[in-house]
Amino acid sequence: MFKKSRHLKNVSNAIKSARVHDVSNGINSKFFDTKKICTYGINGRITVTTFDYTQSLLAVATTAGEIHVYGQKQIEVVFTLKNRPQIKHMRFIKGIYLIAVDEKSNIIVLSVHSKQILTTVFCPNSITCIETDPSLDWMLIGLESGSILIYDVDRNQMSKLKIENFQKSVFLPKERLSPVISIQWNPRDIGTILISYEHITVIYSFIDYKVKQHFFYQLEPYAPGGDLSTNIEKKRTPKVIQSLYHPNSLHILTVHEDNSLVFWDVNSGKLIHARSIFETHVNFPNPALKDCSFTETPAIFKVSWLCQRNPEYTSLLIATKATENPCLPQEITMIDLGGTPMYSVTSFDAMSKYYAKPVQQKLFSLIGKAPLINFLPLPKASPYFGGCHDTNLILLLLEDGELETLIYPAGSFSSKASIFPRSLAWVRPTVTTCIAQSVQKNLWLGMMTIAQSESFLKGGIPATRNIRRHETRSALLTGHSNGSVRIWDASHSEVTDNAVFEVNTAKVLNRATNLAIKNISFASETLELAVSSEVGDVILFKFETNKFYGQLPKSDALQLKFSRFSLDDSKTILVDVSDRGPTNVKQGFIPSTVIHAKKGAVSAIMNSNIGFVAVGFIEGTLIILDRRGPAIIFNENIRVISKAGSSYVSTVHFCVMEYGDDGFSSILMLCGTDIGELMTFKILPATNGRFEVKFTDATKTNNQGKILGINSFAKDTGYSCSATISKMQGLSKGIAIPGFVTISGANDIRLVSPGKSKDTHALFKYPIATSGLSFIPIIDGKGERKLSTIMIVLLINGDIKVLTVPELKEVKNLRCPVPLSAQYVENSSILENGDIVIRTGKFQASLISVLNESATGTNHTADISQHTPIDTLYNPDLKIGYRPQVNSLQWARGTIYCTPYQLDELLGGIERPESKYEESAIARGCISSSSSNAARKLPPGTEDHRYARPVRSSGRSNGYGVLKSVSRAIETRLDTVETTINDYATTMGQTMNDAMEETGRDMMKSAVGF
């Protein structure tokens, strides 16, 4: 007749719980406030990546208008750009500037030193490509109009020098206006650049202000051309899509839209060889050839010319576009060219054969992955040669924002989490589910000391952070699309190490597809792990010493592998997989058993701390496993025993407490279902030393929707009743522990006494995302420490409710400090210390605290308003290696070596203003003035192929030494002249005065035969 008001409901709750001890211990609202502790992952999808070798920093730009810069361990600095621009290009300059170009052709200059945005420059025309050098202030900007602007990053101004569209003005005036397609600085001479337009490629000299050489690729009728050539009966001019220098700068490569790869001689402009990925001499006419334009072939979209530590040993890495044809998976091709023949003694025919017959070719398939849109080589030897100097890691960027890591040249893919910072682990590959859990502090810290923590990035210095005082640590577990599960320390602001445990179910299941992780359960006291794949296989792991560590496969191993090739061949539900653990892991999470029930997708999984594992399937089956056997002790469909018509189990909780009026405690397994029904089971010892499961009751507890979570606590003390080994051992004493159980439904929370009654009920206006109990230590006015048990509820609208128990009375309503995503917020977790891990997006989660630690008295130094300290990115002690120079042959031909100082004069003029930023003065000390200075600051071994800078002498005393060096080279056999003279090239360059320089050059020419 009358609707029950909220006030009457609160009174009813208070009356019901009046006789029960308030385990929240009178906690009040002043103890609570929200603060974001840290963020895991990235906001948005990655669109661009770039790497700085000297500072060892990696930067990624996302669709959310953010640029993340990563260093060693957990170092991360985020630049948030106004208006969320989409970044197209990004480069590091001098290690201290980060340049970004957005889709509207704005140039954004960021300081790695001050971590500030220095300026934004608007470009009057659309930017099609850019080029920078790690050691120079200048940025070359290719425009849609075909012109090239030169931007002085350090002075924040454009150079007066503007390079015209040479295709239109000089070579092909009748062709339509071509944009600049590609720009590359000469790897040995900053005075020249390689420019490509749609139909022609030129070498331009800053010193002479003119084109020094041009390259025009034209196919005669019936020449096959590349894989995508059409109209072969006509003369064609395939458009250029990219051009590259050979690391020695003596040859170039032009890449064309028909997949032609054309090698040219820089000095003469002569075509050396034209090929495609698989075919050679594709520029030679063949009248018998038929038009193959209907043959579907993936188009090349990017090529990198990689070199080993000795830059004369090179290879090509070629990426092709994805097609819709499933029979043509996207691939990356490696063409290993091997050592480059000596230019001075190799004919054009011999050089053509060199490019036609590489040492080897490999195809790296990307089958099953999203389309590849870009790749980034990560060099180990120097920042030069286009960032391709001695790389064994290639970072692949996929269309969906995922990152893959290609081991080069082996061709295998590595998703090893510790290689890069934890935030990038969310996209290597995509996280499919995540949970967070509280772990005993000493146990956790001991376990994490042996976790993998090696990192490719070495840059940056972590900021000093305040350590929060908690008796527990927080573990973050992420499941990924490739079947891997990673276990991290969630306390990002307190732990700077990159330590992570990683397990991979692909090897355990012996499968390459359908591996995505859907459910994870972690027993934090017994260090056991249970995970389920998307097709319903459940894999059990335990933290232990690996008995197969370091073992090589035995002679009968092949037969064993064949017999276990597929789990589908197994006739039993439980499959022993203890021999499928990694042999290179001495101690860690080792697989033990797979539950291969063939029941379809898993709806719920719980690995208890007392050795029992419960697995619920969408089709209704509930399996309970005792890991001590292992043995299945229960296997039934809950649809048979449900009283309310439940279809499947949605969540499981194991606890030790009194059931009804038993007078003693029991192991209870509480199962929530899809319609809000609570099903109670007892786990009892059986006569044969095993355990048995007894169904006791089923009660409809929540209004609507599935049950999201179940928790329990003792009525008298407020401590958790979750099942542990110590509580299980105490059962023999017959002690009764009266307890409450909290059940979270779609939009309500019910508190019940198992086997007795439904007690308090709380209803919320918005649906519940997640909820849980937290156990908060409080120092009262007398200085006494007491425990306050509270219920924290996160709603999907961003409200955070703090409730007392058992009354479920609201103490405070807080607003979540991070935006929520309805699609991912259910992957959030409430932790025992008052923290909440909230998944905010596909690639991101945040750790927040609702506890005001200074008010609780547990940490007087805590300041909830204090901002998170920012890491240091730039290290001024690191020197940029000296740039490689032209070799002896180019010097002998008359190539004038251009110094950075001379280039500054050529591009900036003699009236170039003073530096605008302090970054310039800081970076100036990090540019090596000689190779010896560079060698002192760079990793050992990198000086083997370093090029000494010539130093001009004020006197003539060094002239005799130079001539003596030349004469020794002349006496050496001709085939070693080019090799040995490189050692003298820099000695001869600028150490001679004008007269001695001319004399030495004449002698060199006669020695080589010019």
UniProtKB/Swiss-Prot annotation:
InterPro entries: Lgl_C_dom, WD40/YVTN_repeat-like_dom_sf, WD40_repeat_dom_sf, WD40_rpt
Transmembrane segments: none
GO molecular function annotations of the record: GTPase activator activity; myosin II binding; syntaxin binding
Keyword flag Membrane: no
Residues in WD repeats: 47-80, 87-122, 127-163, 182-215, 240-275, 299-364, 372-407, 431-504, 518-595, 602-637, 649-700, 709-763, 768-815, 829-852
Biological processes, Gene Ontology terms: exocytosis; Golgi to plasma membrane transport
Keyword Repeat: yes
GO cellular component terms attached to this protein's record: cellular bud neck; cytoplasm; plasma membrane
Pfam families in the cross-refs: Lgl_C
Key words, A-Z: Exocytosis, Repeat, WD repeat
SUPFAM superfamilies: WD40 repeat-like
Region (Disordered): 932-958
Family recorded in the similarity comment: Belongs to the WD repeat L(2)GL family.
Self-association state and partner proteins as the record states: Interacts with SEC9.
Role: Acts as an allosteric regulator of polarized exocytosis by promoting the targeted fusion of vesicles with the plasma membrane. Involved in maintenance of ion homeostasis in cells exposed to NaCl stress. May be involved in the targeting of the myosin proteins to their intrinsic pathways. Multicopy suppressor of RHO3. May also participate in the maintenance of cell polarity and bud growth.
Protein name per UniProt: Lethal(2) giant larvae protein homolog SRO77
Organism (species): Saccharomyces cerevisiae (strain ATCC 204508 / S288c)
